[in-house]
Amino acid sequence: MGLSLAAYAGAALAEIAGCFAVWAWWRLGASALWLVPGALSLGAFAWLLALTPVEAAGRSYAVYGGVYVAASLLWLWAVEGVRPDRWDMGGAALVLAGAAVILWAPRG
């Protein structure tokens, strides 16, 4: 379980950072050099997501979706300086609950 959570959290950080590098270049006028660490970060994202001990890729991606939503809101607050509102937090709680059901449901 610890490896799963660490892999999902690391994947979220890597994907969000990689996508933000593209956002910074495309939307904020940052140097195209931002694309280099962005691409490396997106590669790390894929590698970390493949480390999860879930038996099916689609199920792993579904669980990751919940983690991604929550991590994106943390990024919004920590990096962009925009505090998530109660609707953001409620939505994150819902998707995390769904991700937990998918990840920890007893399967035969």
Curated annotation (Swiss-Prot):
A cellular-component GO term for this protein: plasma membrane
Localization per record: Cell inner membrane
Keyword Cell inner membrane: yes
Primary subcellular site in the record, as a coarse category: membrane
Cited InterPro entries: UPF0060
Keywords: Cell inner membrane, Cell membrane, Membrane, Transmembrane, Transmembrane helix
Coiled coil: none
Bilayer-spanning residue ranges: 5-25, 32-52, 62-82, 86-106
SUPFAM superfamilies from the UniProt entry: Multidrug resistance efflux transporter EmrE (SSF103481)
Protein's membrane topology: Multi-pass membrane protein
Family, per entry: Belongs to the UPF0060 family.
Annotated NCBIfam families: PRK02237.1 (NF002586)
Protein name stated in the entry: UPF0060 membrane protein Rsph17029_0436
